[in-house]
Amino acid sequence: MAKKLLLYPAIDLERYSQILDLDVDLNIINADSLEEAQFHITDARGFYGKITPELLTLAEQLTWVQSPTASLEHYVFDQLIDHPCTLTNMKGLFYDVIADHVMCYVLMFARRMHLYMRSQFESKWSPIGGENARSSFTVGPGAVTGMDQAHMHIADCTMGVVGCGSIGSEICNRASHFGMKVIAVDPDVSAEPCGVSELRGTNELPWLLAESDFVVIAAPHTPETEGLFDDAMIAQIKPGGYLINIGRGVIVKLAALSAALERGHLSGAALDVFETEPLPSEHPLWEREDVILTPHVAACSVRVPERHLDTLLENIRRFASDEPLLNVTNKARWY
């Protein structure tokens, strides 16, 4: 008898038809209602969608659950962690897209674009460092002006990446191609990402913070990373450094970040994710010239949806053929 794969909530007919076109020996159920899902989960071997404690309790033969998301902090629950089924996620979809977003932040800070855009909106010609600091032929070769000093040379900078999954690894790669020195920390130090000059364990995070001009958080939301960047941790960032978070909003305490910016410990911050989303309009970060805020769009690209579908189709094919699945997670660690 063919293994049963339950899809719930039901996916749209166009994507469902592509699953049916896989030519695999599976009984695929696209459940339109909770009642239908409850009926079919009892003997389903595979599941795609949003599993709940109620559905999991009814499952008697379940061996595989495919999350529709890469992040798992809102997906896993105690019963699922304890269940013997394999949980796979959708990691690996956004690596280049988010890395580009990070490098955009870095370039904006280094070339002061975040400030020049404000000047443009006000129709102001305001070179940072002052117009009177502009180089002229009366100044001899080798003289560094205030205008020069006000703009960063990226190849002289160090980027520290916190978390070297698919996204963090590609950030390291992109940064190295800009000539930056790249260091990183990750729980797994067995494989050094391309472009990284030194990879250490997460216990060496203070070392990374002290050495980096740009600290990039590319870590997932886990019990260990929640609230990790508090007052004490942010205080360990190199004075004048920049903090970039494209990982998860709950990793950075915004009150602590705001305080560090206010006292001048950090030169700036760029955030795509926040403790509360949307970020309230009255939050003080909106008004800061040294902050770049984007509304959780770092992963947006026309390529991501097709990769999402391709990953699902490939895992369904592997499930039907009893082959090793892609993106097997550690349920207890949420990634």
Each PLM stretch: what is its role?
Residues I183:
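Conserved beta-strand positions in the Rossmann-like core of class I SAM-dependent methyltransferases
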Residues G240, I246-Y335:
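Rossmann-like dinucleotide-binding domain for NAD(H)/NADP(H)
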Residues P187-P284:
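Rossmann-like adenosine-cofactor binding region
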Residues M1-K91, D230:
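An N-terminal-biased, well-structured beta-alpha scaffold segment characteristic
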Residues C85, K91-T158:
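Phosphate-binding beta-alpha-beta segment of Rossmann-like dinucleotide-binding domains, i.e.
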Residues C164-G165:
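Glycine-rich Rossmann-fold phosphate-binding loop(s) that bind the pyrophosphate
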Residues A99-R118, S176-M180, D310-R318, E323:
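Oxidoreductase and adenylate-handling cofactor-binding alpha/beta cores
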Residues G168-S169:
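N-terminal Rossmann-fold NAD(P) dinucleotide-binding loop
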